Every structure is written in structure tokens, then in C-alpha cells.
């Protein structure tokens, strides 16, 4: 399966590693060029918790990450979701499954993040939410 993880902080990089190393999916990990987490992964291939599987395609090309994926995992700040999704929804999303991997509600509206995604054009029928332990260390044990 082709999976893209949008957001390459600790949680996003862990999810990409898990998808590639454990589940053996084909994975693209997207991050914004210039951000500390992306630049560290690009330079070192690792962060303080995981070393990226060599099969992971680390990219700052959002169109490539979205277009190639069957499943799109979003792992960014919950408060950035509404402003980020218009960048995603300008691409063809037909048949793509979205997994929101962030906790919380939208400040100011009190809306669940799945509601925010729907308002931004993500099909609610193709949206799942994955939250778990607050720290990736819990998964690495």
C-alpha cells in the first residue's frame, strides 16, 4: 500500500517508520523544507527516537506526497490543520483515505479535528482518527 505521512515531527516520523519497517508499506514522509525536524531527518536520517527506514522517501514536495498515496496520515499541530488542509485539497483526493493523528479540538470553535477536515473538503466517509499514547516512547517499548 502507498502511504504518505504529512508532518515529520517525532510522531509523524515514528508513524512513517512503523508503516515502512513494520507494516512494509511504501512510504513517503513529507515535511516543510527549512523546518528543524525536516532538515534533521534530511541531514541525519534520524531524530532522537528513531532512525528512518531506508525505504522511506523523505520529501518536501506536497503534491508528490498527496498524489502518490492511497492513505494519507496527517501528523501536524492540531491548531494548524485548518490552515494546512487547503494546500492538500487542491490536489485530486478521489478515493484517498485520511487518518488524522493529532489530539485536541480546534481552539476558538471547539470543533473536533474530523469536523475541521470535513469543512475543508476531506470526505468524512474516508476519514479516520488515530490517537493513542501521548509519547512515541510508549510504542517503542
Model-derived segments and their meaning:
Residues 31-33, 62, 78, 133:
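Short glycine-rich, polar/acidic loop-and-turn segments at beta strand-coil junctions
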Residues 52, 71-141:
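Rossmann-like NAD(P)(H) cofactor-binding subdomain of soluble oxidoreductases
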Residues 65-67:
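A short, aliphatic-rich alpha-helical micro-motif
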